[in-house]
Amino acid sequence: IVGQLVEIPVGPKEHRRLIPIITDEYPDPDFGSGAVKITGAHDFNDYAVAMRNAIPLYALMDTKGAMRQDGLPYADSAAIATRAANGEDVGDVSNVNLVPEDLRGLDRYDARKLVIDQIGAEGLAVTYLHKEIDRETGAEHLERRALVDAKPIMQPFGDRSGVVIEPMLTDQWFVDTQRIVGPALDAVRDGRTQIIPDQHRKV
């Protein structure tokens, strides 16, 4: 099946995109099925897999953790992504928005729940039987739930905020501190810049 294309079961059926089945050393065959979907723009490990396998980096979220609203309509974006899955060089994908219209602008957690519900409604989600006991009556309540809800995943959290850190590709700016520090130190040494109070000159 390697090299074949599979449908992502999200979005309008007539416009669903296809992705290639690839092999890579990253997935753990002892965790779940050993198959994973790669979202290179939003996961450190997926980024490495995408780079090794020439998978375009499609951004799905904005800087506030909501699903993107900008870019091309979903149908156009899905068509471009499917061409890329077939090996075509599609160039810059920054305007490609693979978030279906009904999910655009939603908080990532709300969108995730809707995606799970949509996949479940089509009978495509792997499910398990969840049992709850009513504390007052002792009655047992069984409910079928998507297995994805019960699977533990590694997520980085901010050490101060406790909020989930969502990796995303952004422009990075670097400053050549060697070129900046030298003239600044010279200005302090020759008196053009005065540090007040004086004891902080060494800092």
At which residue positions do the language-model features occur?
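Short conserved beta-strand and strand-loop elements enriched in small hydrophobics
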Residues: G3-P12
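Short coil-to-beta-strand transition motifs
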Residues: K13-R17
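Short beta-strand-centered aromatic/proline hotspots
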Residues: L18-D24
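Residue patterns forming the tRNA-binding/recognition surfaces of aminoacyl-tRNA synthetases
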Residues: Y26-V203
